[in-house]
Amino acid sequence: MINPAKRTSTIELSQIRKMFEVTNPTAINLGIGEPDFDVPENIKLAMEQSIKNNETHYTPNKGYIELREAITQKFKKDNNINTNPENIIVTAGASEALYMCAQAFIDKNDEVILPDPSFLSYEACIKLADGKVVGVNCEMENEFKLKASDVQEKINKNTKAIILNSPSNPTGAVMDKEDIKAIADLSIDHDFLIISDEIYEKIIYDKKHYSPAAYSDNVITINGFSKTYAMTGLRIGYLNAKEEYLEELLKIHQYNIACANSTAQRGAYEALTGPQDTVNKMVNEFKKRRDLIVSRLNEMGYKTVNAQGAFYVFPKIENPEKFVKKSAENGVITVPGAAFGQNGKNHVRMSYANSYENIVKAMDILEKGVN
């Protein structure tokens, strides 16, 4: 037998995906992080027209210039980030952008600071680059928000980067402006990289989103179209970085996939430049669902923070593994919080990217059959 590379032994296949493969397909799925809405019609039409125009060949490595220009305008308008199309790479989803960052900048034993809990792909990407994860606890008492003062305590001569994710998967936490700016200042003072995953930027309720790249140029900003425009299967995202970073990132991108999907790029352009009413409707619906699930869980005695963004809640639950197992047996899929870090071990992640009616049914099942 041919032995696999040692680096793959440091990670495992996603426990979330494994669980979905063995659960009852008729169960109510509160586990998956995917909008239950369809791609808006104007985006579908743009992609259909692209195929009719035979735009099915390679695009420039960085992506179509029209799309990169639209992304540049989006950064200026929404994020107060002044950039240009040459500093943008269109990627195969935000996931590729994250992997590119790790491969381009993380060396053996470099330390990367991560919020704990955080999206499980972050740790995997760091380990595949032979880096070392340094966790910073995000406490429930502070609504799971990452604090700059806690980050500062973890910085040393080996610190290479920090990954930020606001709004957060799995907690729905939205970082305060003061902490975003303070961490940006720390990146300048201590010369480390900020990788800012802003994929949930538009799915935000009672707060405002802030980008660290508005305060420091030691930042690679990652975003995409999967969550905001329900384009998960089309695998289209992007990143922005200063010129000296971009050349290294482009090496990984160029030899990995050459370019992002041409048809999806045309859809992405329409997403940014077309009407945004479907996004607003989706976010309003998510807010209603959040209010429902938070209220029901708290009524059941499961302490739950009122998430400010994304579409997840992270209730505190005694014996989460037993809860997840019993929930699945009764027809509701949830995810153990330990999948997202040591600090998530007393929690369960639930996604409200499911219909209002299904969430009501799921809460009734949990109340009767699990609680």
Language-model features, listed with the residues they occupy:
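Short, Lys/Arg-rich amphipathic segments at extreme N-termini
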Residues: K6-N24
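Conserved N-terminal alpha-helix of the aminotransferase class I/II PLP-enzyme fold
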Residues: Y58-A92
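Short, N-terminal intrinsically disordered low-complexity segments that are rich in Pro/Gly
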Residues: S9-E12, G33, F37, H57
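Conserved donor sugar-nucleotide recognition element shared by glycan-biosynthetic enzymes
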Residues: E12-I16, Y64, A94-S95, F144
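N-terminal alpha-helical segment of soluble enzymes
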Residues: Q49-E55
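Conserved PLP-binding active-site segment in aminotransferase class I/II-type PLP enzymes
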Residues: M1-E12, G63-E66
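PLP-dependent class I/II
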Residues: I2-P4, E21-T23, I28, I32-Q49, ...
